[in-house]
């Protein structure tokens, strides 16, 4: 027997929870359900467990306008974000709308009936079920949760040590006092590397090409003053608008004056790392700022790890894996 709802939401992560809130608020007469393949809410924030997992945008804008972020850290650690999402689900009575362990397998649309038919499978039992709905709202994100993307590297099977994908991080992984190579310099890498640097013997951050990286304050003094003067609840709309304005100005500045923006970003790295570091090789991208995402690091934690000698930067192309490390096109081998 089919189950009919007006709106079917796929995914109980940050987007799916927001969709449910607005449906309840703006369309209280409409029925809906949330299908979630896993056994918990949170999506990315309950799946990813690698060291240092955090938001790479401030939570005042990344979080909900209808549920104020009240932690002091703007760029929050993963567990704090998951706690925040749990709080939103409880606050707005969304939990009873979620069908956990339910994976969407197939969808079809009937023009004659103006209905979607959605076939699902119970992850635990394998049983199938069909839903019908007038609107299907996809809030699944863009990750394949069971297997992250892994490039093909020549000779990778020869490497004798463990190879770990951050998306599939296991809490039992022991990297204490070991040399680690982290491939990439995007948002995941700039989060992972500083968090591992206090425990690992040394980390090499291997990138094919540089990224723009900006240090931002973790505990913004302006936010702190507004909270003290107005309180958490009344200050939140102002703090949110301030962060939106700051991000918009950064973007617009980069679009209108790309060369000046480039000097600003690279100048910040030069100031953080001091003289003697090859900024041009490792931190000057070939593209203009905001042609790709800007990576932000709270309180310059990545730069501090580099400055203290815990992390080395290598900019080169991978030729192949070896038994003990990675051979680069330049002829150098990293172990």
Walk through the language-model features, giving the residues of each:
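Rossmann-like dinucleotide-binding core of oxidoreductases
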Residues: 2-4, 8-10, 14, 18-34, ...
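Core beta-strand elements of the Rossmann-like FAD/NAD(P) dinucleotide-binding domain
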Residues: 3-5, 124-135, 175-176, 330-335
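Beta1-alpha1 glycine-rich phosphate/pyrophosphate-binding loop at the start
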Residues: 5-9, 14-98, 207-208, 271-273, ...
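Short hydrophobic core segments
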Residues: 10, 130-143, 180-183, 318, ...
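Short beta-strand to alpha-helix junction loop
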Residues: 69-87, 99, 183, 253-262, ...
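Feature captures the FAD/FMN-dependent oxidoreductase FAD-binding
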Residues: 72-144
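A conserved short coil-to-beta-strand element within the FAD-binding core of flavoproteins
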Residues: 100-115, 311-329
């Amino acid at each position: 027997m089919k189950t009919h709802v007006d709106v079917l939401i796929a995914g109980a992560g940050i987007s799916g929870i927001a969709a449910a809130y607005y449906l309840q608020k703006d369309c209280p007469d409409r029925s809906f359900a949330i299908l979630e393949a896993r056994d918990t809410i949170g999506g990315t924030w309950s799946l990813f467990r690698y060291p240092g997992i955090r938001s790479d945008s401030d939570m005042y804008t990344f979080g909900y306008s209808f549920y104020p972020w009240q932690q002091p850290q703007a760029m929050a650690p993963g567990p704090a974000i998951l706690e925040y999402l749990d709080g939103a689900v409880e606050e707005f009575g969304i939990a009873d709308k979620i069908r956990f362990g339910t994976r969407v397998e197939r969808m079809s649309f009937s023009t004659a009936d103006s209905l979607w038919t959605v076939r699902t499978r119970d992850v635990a039992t394998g049983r199938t079920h069909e839903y019908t709905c007038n609107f299907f709202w996809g809030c699944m994100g863009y990750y394949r949760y069971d297997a992250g993307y892994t490039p093909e590297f020549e000779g990778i099977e020869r490497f004798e040590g463990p190879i770990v994908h951050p998306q599939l991080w296991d809490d039992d992984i022991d990297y204490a006092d070991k040399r680690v190579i982290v491939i990439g310099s995007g948002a995941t890498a700039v989060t992972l590397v500083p968090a591992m640097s206090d425990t690992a013997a040394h980390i090499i951050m291997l990138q094919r090409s540089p990224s723009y990286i900006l240090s931002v304050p973790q505990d913004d003094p302006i936010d702190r003053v507004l909270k003290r003067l107005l309180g958490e609840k009344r200050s939140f709309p102002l703090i949110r608008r301030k962060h939106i304005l700051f991000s918009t100005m950064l973007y617009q500045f980069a679009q209108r004056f790309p060369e000046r923006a480039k000097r600003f970003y690279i100048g910040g790295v030069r100031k953080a790392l001091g003289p003697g570091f090859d900024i041009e090789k490792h931190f000057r991208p070939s593209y203009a700022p905001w042609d790709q995402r800007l990576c932000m690091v709270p309180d310059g934690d990545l730069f501090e790890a580099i400055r203290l000698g815990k992390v080395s930067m290598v900019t080169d192309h991978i030729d192949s894996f070896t038994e003990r490390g990675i051979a680069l096109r330049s002829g150098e081998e990293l172990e």
